[in-house]
């Protein structure tokens, strides 16, 4: 509250809050009080979380009510799901914890791809896939969650159907999903990627995103193209907003 009051004394600026709102009533009340005491608008990041798939609606509705009371609150919402990118050019891939992969991970991409195409390297990696549950790397525990992993494609498909997940393809074809991932990531000379939608994809589609964008308390935002660029790159959210929502979907 003290920080908010100082911003109010300055007479300009926006209070930006990022919170999971685990204790919704208490945390939202604090955010609202910051806006009320400062007289400044409040912006909060809002998205559909898998564990609480309807809370985004409650949050935006509460913001609308606060604004009607004279406390301006807006929810920043994304233009699509926030997703992890896996590939040989990024931080994550399904084989990153394998000793055989670690042995070649330092190589330039072209040399690494050449090594990955050797039968002995392929066998050494695919026979020893592990997940390091102690790894501090964001997203590293998801590298073999085949049911939520999709070929990103070119052009990218940011609303993939469940039938196109690596797990679903493996079930239909009788293939090993790890083998599918291995071959996929070698496409386009090792630049192909796997997409793992997390936030805003609890229903397996982007219907909730559409509702968020149309809500009177929402403003489009949340494009992350810097701090996590090796894992998450959502800098194209504005393009998605204009091209995909405005024209294609």
Predicted features and spans:
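Active-site neighborhoods of metal-dependent hydrolases
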Residues: 1-8, 13-249
